[in-house]
Amino acid sequence: MVYIGTYTRTEEQGIHWLKLDMGTGKLTASGKLSGQKNPSFLAIHPNKKFLYAVNEIGNYKDEKAGAVSAYSIDQKTGALTFLNQQSSKGGAPCHLVLDATGRNVLVANYTGGSVASLPVSRKGRLRPASSFIQHTGSSLLKPRQAAPHSHSINVSPGNKFAVVADLGLDRVLVYGFDSKGGKMTPAGFAKVTPGSGPRHFAFHPSGKFAYLINEITLTLNVFVWDEMRGKLNELQTIATLPVERGKGMSTAEVQVHPNGRFLYGSNRGHDTIAVFRIDQKTGKLSAVQHQSTLGKTPRNFGIDPTGKYLIAANQSSGDLFTFSINRDSGELKPTGYSIKVPMPVCVKFLDLPGK
């Protein structure tokens, strides 16, 4: 099953779920749950029984904050049932993740410039935030970087740290993370070139390397990751474009292939997926391909857990296209299949035990 988070212009829009034919790459609509506002970014519980979505809004009840919603997943059909909702403690939550134990949802608030963790009950319901950290400061490009903008949050391979890319600060902030209590505590940061605009972040399957995609400069930073100390040491900066940056261009998503040999990043405006080969000894990147996403504004994409297909989500053209992945080169090839989904923002895969 493939779940698609979206921006909602009407009450009828919401979270979509699709079936992916693993033989051909064909996508077919399976269901939709409407009624929630801007369930843009999604995360699936490690036990595969629950799904969580940010509600990317600025006002939740009496707070200047967004929200996070919890859903149960029907193990046979993949259908979602709303469970409950809690404040994200900051405005416009745009990214979330569950820790490895499934006890906590960690959320990044973009306009709020903050992060929070919300405990998860055994029945999948969310409890009020157990930890909240407000970022402060600014960076080079005003007004874009006049304030902090937490754009993503990831949990380290050892489940000991939370790593936050802040577009407004040009920093990747590291927090010690206690999964039992859901507490985050500051543990340092890595700076990037001023004006870069850190957006999304991905760890290598080996746990040795990490990758940051920068929205404003359309670059990738390669880091060595020290799980013992929670330290990031920069190795390389490489452009995501094969040409000079043009007006209206920006990056969006970054993901590492499950086999750890390739990395993918999306370029909005240029409307491509950049493919890179990963040096297995050093973690450094070398460019392989720039594949058109066949639509406009690839805000997100997903790689299926087997590593066979990539699904590109084109926000502005309202469509998703599937691409087969060459296991030897990492190159993408269109399957010829696509499907219309209004304003897609996030792609998440789930292999249902009941299927």
Segments (PLM) and residue ranges:
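Blade-loop segments of beta-propeller domains
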Residues: 29-102
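Short glycine/acidic-enriched loop and turn motifs that connect beta-strands
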Residues: 8-11, 56-62, 111-114, 169-171, ...
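Beta-rich, blade/repeat-based domains predominating
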Residues: 11, 36-46, 89-104, 136-159, ...
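A short beta-strand motif characteristic of beta-propeller blades
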Residues: 28-34, 81-86, 137-143, 185-191, ...
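Short loop/turn segments immediately following beta-strands, especially the blade-tip
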Residues: 18-25, 71-78, 117-127, 175-183, ...
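Blade-level signature of beta-propeller repeat domains, shared across WD40, Kelch, NHL, RCC1
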Residues: 315-355
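An edge-strand/N-cap motif at the start of beta-rich repeat modules
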Residues: 1-21
